[in-house]
């Protein structure tokens, strides 16, 4: 299958996708009623889109093209309002978090959608196990070569994005000992992790052509890389974050990625090389396992440094770009988070350590998303 031409988009514009949990009180397991909610809210939308994801317990909120985080926040807030209203009318709850802590994958119903049914045929039970919840951020690029450079540049900071957003310590009723267990779900997929090395858009088109030979790849959407180009939108899409518990944190993560993209494309601080990726999965694992307490290893020098310290360095580097884009509030909030030394996975564990239950945890998450 031929690859779409790269659609020219305004650099640094934003799109945000949030995969939300649809919850069934009073037991607070996952519901299978996302279709009911989607049908109820679609006529009320004035911007953005609310749609299905893989299974009937998932609901995706997606903004339109936004010039800055304020516009994105306004669209997401409006969608949040109509979803919460519809959920209340149908006696359902909505919450964030990268995993549901005690759902059973065997109970998950794959959406009655041609693409997802085809994916179920290809991947079997792996698709039901992929009932996990992430935040994706699109950043606009002027051309395909810029998109490939940006993808490689952003890949340096995949551990930082994971650690800041980690919100999936529990799965199948157990503490996984990971800050972000969600990404482990995709480890069995043949396209898990970083995109195979290419140096420009022409080489990427050749890569896509070869991948399509497998008959498992019909479009870019069938590739589950941590970061991928989206030629139809003219963007690069970062896909490694857990869905946050609050809309504010989702906006902060989007602001960081937007500012990082601006810094990378204007300063060009890296000359991408294939060797950059030799320790990619090791550093990614550190972020998933330990969050901000993880340790990064420099592939060229062997130097090791705390992920929290390197994240503060990233925030300092992108601050001038954030100011130009109107995203400095996001950088300030994330800097405070790092200095306090926590993420949402840590909060969840503290809730349980204080005597809370996993059912109570999801109840609390629904209250947080509803602003209670």
From Swiss-Prot:
The keyword Nuclease does not apply. Keywords: ATP-binding, Ligase, Nucleotide-binding. Gene3D superfamilies: 3.30.590.20. Its EC number is 6.3.2.2. It holds the Pfam family GCS2. It catalyses: L-cysteine + L-glutamate + ATP = gamma-L-glutamyl-L-cysteine + ADP + phosphate + H(+). GO terms for molecular function: ATP binding; glutamate-cysteine ligase activity. GO terms for biological process: modified amino acid biosynthetic process. The keyword NAD does not apply. Belongs to the glutamate--cysteine ligase type 2 family. YbdK subfamily. ATP-dependent carboxylate-amine ligase which exhibits weak glutamate--cysteine ligase activity. This is Putative glutamate--cysteine ligase 2. It comes from Salmonella newport (strain SL254). The gene is ybdK.
């Amino acid at each position: 299958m031929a690859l779409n031409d790269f659609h020219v988009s305004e650099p640094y514009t934003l799109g945000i996708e949030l995969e939300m949990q649809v919850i069934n009180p009073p037991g607070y397991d996952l519901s299978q009623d996302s279709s009911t909610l989607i049908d109820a809210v679609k006529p009320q939308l004035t911007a953005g889109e609310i749609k299905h994801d893989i299974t009937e317990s998932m609901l995706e909120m997606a903004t339109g093209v936004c010039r800055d985080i304020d516009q994105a926040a306004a669209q997401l807030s409006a969608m949040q309002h109509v979803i919460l209203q519809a959920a209340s009318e149908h006696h359902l709850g909505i919450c964030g978090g990268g995993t549901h802590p005690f759902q059973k994958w065997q109970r998950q119903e794959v959406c009655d959608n041609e693409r997802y049914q085809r994916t179920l045929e290809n991947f079997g039970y792996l698709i039901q196990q992929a009932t996990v919840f992430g935040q994706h951020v699109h950043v606009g690029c002027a051309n395909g070569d810029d998109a490939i450079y940006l993808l490689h540049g952003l890949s340096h900071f995949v551990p930082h994005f994971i650690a800041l957003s980690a919100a999936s310590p529990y799965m199948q009723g157990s503490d996984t000992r990971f800050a972000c267990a969600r990404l482990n779900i995709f480890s069995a997929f043949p396209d898990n992790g970083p995109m195979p090395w290419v140096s420009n858009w022409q080489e990427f088109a050749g890569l896509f052509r070869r991948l399509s030979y497998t008959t498992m790849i019909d479009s870019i959407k069938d590739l589950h890389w941590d970061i991928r180009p989206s030629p139809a939108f003219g963007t690069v899409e970062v896909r490694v974050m857990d869905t946050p518990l609050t809309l504010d944190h989702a906006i902060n993560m989007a602001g960081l990625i937007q500012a990082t993209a601006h810094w990378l494309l204007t300063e060009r601080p890296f000359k991408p090389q294939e060797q950059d990726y030799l320790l990619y999965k090791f550093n990614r694992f550190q972020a998933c396992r330990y969050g901000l307490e993880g340790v990064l290893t420099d592939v060229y020098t062997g130097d090791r440094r705390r992920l929290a310290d390197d994240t503060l360095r990233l925030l300092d580097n992108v601050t001038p770009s954030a100011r130009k884009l109107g995203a400095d509030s996001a950088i300030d909030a994330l800097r405070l988070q790092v200095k306090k030394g926590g993420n949402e996975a840590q909060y969840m564990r503290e809730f349980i350590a204080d005597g809370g239950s996993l059912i109570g945890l999801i109840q609390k998450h629904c209250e947080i998303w509803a602003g209670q």
